[in-house]
């Protein structure tokens, strides 16, 4: 099969449907087919457009497939999705999308399906979604927001008026969020440097020290990135790390640190002094932290492979601790569209809640009296956020909720158990944080 961007996208989509881990699968397929430049960008655009709109694409295709999509061979299913995505969302002419899809059936040795692909796409590409009649609000949300049933039901229950927008809202204005390294520059100066290099739509974000920019390629391709002038990190994530209020000379723990963005911000706040222990449970993810720290030139960071649910004698008592715990990820559904189709299994959710609670208890033991603990997630699930903090305070009366010095952006929902960012209200990722003080 000759290498081409459409074939690469379809091959990656077949693997993604089987195995998940969308970004890793796409990267591997692009390397395997040796795509570069525009071809690489086009393949990536097809892949992520299908993931982002899969619910809508599938609904439309099902109107013209009496036996349904599930009965088709996986390559044929993904060829249909990819072609419809191009015609509907990527401004590719219908004739080109259809003709190239028919060619792909031969490339994937599915020539017997070429007639079906041609006939279905010529009708599907002109389908008017405004004429659709949905069975109920859940189906409407699954189709218009491109979500699985479990996620659609969660959003309909908890955020009924914002559900579709939460699924599709582009956090940080659809731009890449950066953190200026204050040891080398500041946000205003970084904006000027990026603009001088031809980067478009550069502006400061709402979180102090953040910068938003639109890059033609990867932000990691910039010389300023390689020189440690900035790292890539969402504004909501930056806000959580700022609430730790790390100071020079302190001992600070980042318990669930990979891939390392918050560690870098904490090291910056500490002015590369004191000791920052940056930990993660997987060694390959710890290596990501090491790579980022080395690029930025920090010498006050010690990396450690560590299970944060257990007390590790290698970790000292700390002045400040950040616990950015594993979570359901329901706050970043637009950024990671494959999460929209996850099963919200009650048993797995109970395990996740227990893991979060165990990490909080570990942090409580490691924190010095008078110290600051910040708990954060990238979910908008109340059980993992406000209710988790309420339960922690019941177990640990030596803690109280603290008010961070950093001002929260407009739209944050602040309660007695922490602060919540909902994308449609703040313009940032869905995120939760709570600053806690150990009083004795």
Where are the regions that the model predicts?
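S-adenosylmethionine
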Residues: 1-440
């Amino acid at each position: 099969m000759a290498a081409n961007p459409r074939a690469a996208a379809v091959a990656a989509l077949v693997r993604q449907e089987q195995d998940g881990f969308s970004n890793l699968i796409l990267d591997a397929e692009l390397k395997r087919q040796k795509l570069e430049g525009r071809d690489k960008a086009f393949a990536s655009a097809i892949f992520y457009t299908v993931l982002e709109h899969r619910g809508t694409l599938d609904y439309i295709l099902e109107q013209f497939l009496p036996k349904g999509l599930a009965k088709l061979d996986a390559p044929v299913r993904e060829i249909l999705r990819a072609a419809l995505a191009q015609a509907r969302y990527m401004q590719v002419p219908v004739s080109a999308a259809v003709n190239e899809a028919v060619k792909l059936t031969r490339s994937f040795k599915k020539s017997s399906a070429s007639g079906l692909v041609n006939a279905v796409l010529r009708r599907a590409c002109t389908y008017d979604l405004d004429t659709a009649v949905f069975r109920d609000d859940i189906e409407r949300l699954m189709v218009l927001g491109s979500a699985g049933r479990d996620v659609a039901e969660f959003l309909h229950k908890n955020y009924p008026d914002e559900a579709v927008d939460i699924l599709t809202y582009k956090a940080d204005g659809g731009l890449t969020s950066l953190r200026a390294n204050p040891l080398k520059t500041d946000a205003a100066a970084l904006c000027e440097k990026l603009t001088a290099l031809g980067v478009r739509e550069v502006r400061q974000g709402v979180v102090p020290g953040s910068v938003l920019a639109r890059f033609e390629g990867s932000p990691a391709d910039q010389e300023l990135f390689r020189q440690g002038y900035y790292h890539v990190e969402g504004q909501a994530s930056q806000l959580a790390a700022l609430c730790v209020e790390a100071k020079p000379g302190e001992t600070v723990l980042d318990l669930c640190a990979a891939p390392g963005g918050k560690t870098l911000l904490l090291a910056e706040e500490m002015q590369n002094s004191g000791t920052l222990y940056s930990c993660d449970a997987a060694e390959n993810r710890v290596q990501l932290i090491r790579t980022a720290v080395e690029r930025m030139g920090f010498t006050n960071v010690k990396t450690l492979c560590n299970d944060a649910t257990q007390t590790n004698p290698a970790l000292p008592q700390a002045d400040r601790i950040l616990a950015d715990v594993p979570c359901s990820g329901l706050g970043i559904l637009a950024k990671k569209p494959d999460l929209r189709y996850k099963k919200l299994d009650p048993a797995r959710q109970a395990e996740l809640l227990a893991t979060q609670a165990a990490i909080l208890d570990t942090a409580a033991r490691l924190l010095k009296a008078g110290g600051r603990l910040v708990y954060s997630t990238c979910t908008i699930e109340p059980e993992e956020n406000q209710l988790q903090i309420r339960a922690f305070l019941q177990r640990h009366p030596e803690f109280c909720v603290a008010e961070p010095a950093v001002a929260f952006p407009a739209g944050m929902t602040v309660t007695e158990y922490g602060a919540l960012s909902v994308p449609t209200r703040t313009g940032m990722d869905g995120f939760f944080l709570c600053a806690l003080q150990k009083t004795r």
